Amino acid sequence: DFCRWYQENCGQNPAWHTNMIAEIKAWLSDKQISYAYFHTEKIDTNRLPAMYELVKDLTEDLVKKYQQGNFLYLPPIDRTVGKNGRMPVWICWWQGISEAPELVQKCVARMEKMFGDKADIRIITFDNYRQYIAFSETVAEKFNKGCISMTHLSDILRAQLLCRYGGLWIDATYYIWDDRFIDALCQFPFFTQKQGGELNELDIVSGRWANNFMKGPAGFPLFGFMVEAFELFWGKYDEVLNYFLFDYIIAVCYEQLPEIRMIMGACPVNNRFSQVLADWGNEACDPHKLELLTADTWLFKLTYKKQFSMQTSDGQRTYYAALLEEE
């Protein structure tokens, strides 16, 4: 699989990153993984909201740099990450998991159980983030002034962690159903939760990626592009002009850099019903429906902003209860 090949041939070798795209494309070709088979269509960018054009214009020179193969390389700060070939898994809860809502604690405990010794899980907090990354003076200053929220600071953190170390970033409110995720994560160079479906100019993502569940090797150009695009944005603006800034940055990289798009496209559609239980969590569990859901989906996105119950008002087991019973 890709994870083993990467560890044996590439690792943290800076020289390898200069030829990363060619190496990954060769690996995909050798494994006979077709780009065309997967969901790689482009949206008609002429119909996208103005935010896309703003980010595209802002990153015009950056896109040209990446088109020439001049990718960002950020060396690791903590060289113990991923030791013994284990994949880094990044989870962030700024105040620490002990201070997190109960649902978050349950989700993270489930991740730790399911990954076991197969991954190097790192939980990032305000107390330890400097051990792994370094925010620029611009970002630090604008965060301290209140221009950058904790949510958008975590976006910048995510980009840096993935660029420096690679591995998987997973939102703390994802619940892993079973161990199918191990094969899925290691089978492809880039992996993300990808619902697929029809392209929609009103939805910049259109099921092509999920920025809260992304895995790839250290130095993967998408991650470097994200780091540099955030710096460009916050160097110019003092407020987030659109909540989905992160996705617009990914979209520009996806649309403007065909080789990155092909590698992202090699990740198959997966976990199509990932969002369902956030809506159905308090409904009475239909075992047949649950079986159909989990035949397709092993990753469920929940929310701590909603109160989930173990039983309905008439005493029936809920979908949320069914999830927790898997523990």
Task: Identify the meaning behind each predicted range.
Residues D1-S154, A172-E327:
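Glycosyltransferase-associated regions of secretory-pathway enzymes
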Residues Y165, I170-A172:
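Active-site acidic Asp-centered loop
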Residues D155-Y165:
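Small-residue hinge/turn detector
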